[in-house]
Amino acid sequence: MSTRAPVELDFLGLRAAAADADDRHAKSGGSSASSSSSIRGMETSAIARIGPHLLRRVIAAARPPPPPSTAPVPEEMPGAAAAAAPMTLFYNGSVAVFDVSHDKAEAIMRMATEATKAKGLARGNAIVGNFAKEPLTRTKSLQRFLSKRKERLTSLGPYQVGGPAAVGATTSTTTKSFLAKEEEHTAS
C-alpha cells in the first residue's frame, strides 16, 4: 500500500519569499536553512512567518487572497451559460435524461411548479368534498372508541379516588388516595 505525499498550497506566496531569503542568507555567508528549519526544537511554519497584520486580514476575509499575478485567473466564458447540461426528470415511474441549457431548465421547472400548484388547489377542494359526504357512523364509532379508552385509562390510574366499586373490584379492602395515605403517615 503506497502512501501519498501531502499536498501543500502556497496561497500567500511564502515559498518564493522564503527561497529568496534563503538565497540572500547563503550569499551573505550564513548556513542555508530550509523552510522547515528548527529553531530551539520548534519547527517554524508558514503561519509563524506571516506578518500579524497580513494574518488578521487573511483570517477575516471570506475567501483566500487572489493568487499571485503569475497564475492565470480563469475567466467565465460567454458560451458557458448556453452550454447544455444533463437534466434528469422522474415522471410516472420512468427516468428520462435530457441535455438542456440552464435557461430552458429553469423554464421547465417553473412550468412544472405552476402546474403542480394548480392541481393541488383543485385536488384540495375534491378532498374536502369527499369528507363532507362521508357518513356520520365513522365519527360516532370514533367517539365511542375514545370514550371507552378514556374509561380504561382512568380505571388503571395509580391514584384511585372512588374506592373498589368504581374500579369494579370485588375485594373488601378499601383503596385510599395518595393524599389520604400521606396524611396518615405524617400524623403518626
From Swiss-Prot:
Post-translational modification: Ubiquitinated. Targeted for degradation by the SCF(COI1) E3 ubiquitin ligase-proteasome pathway during jasmonate signaling.
Keywords, in A-Z order: Jasmonic acid signaling pathway, Transcription, Transcription regulation, Ubl conjugation
Identification of the protein by name: Protein TIFY 9
Pfam families tied to this protein: Jas_motif, tify
Motif Jas, residue range(s) on this chain: 135-160
Functional note: Repressor of jasmonate responses.
Keyword Transcription: yes
Ranges where the record places region Disordered: 20-41, 156-188
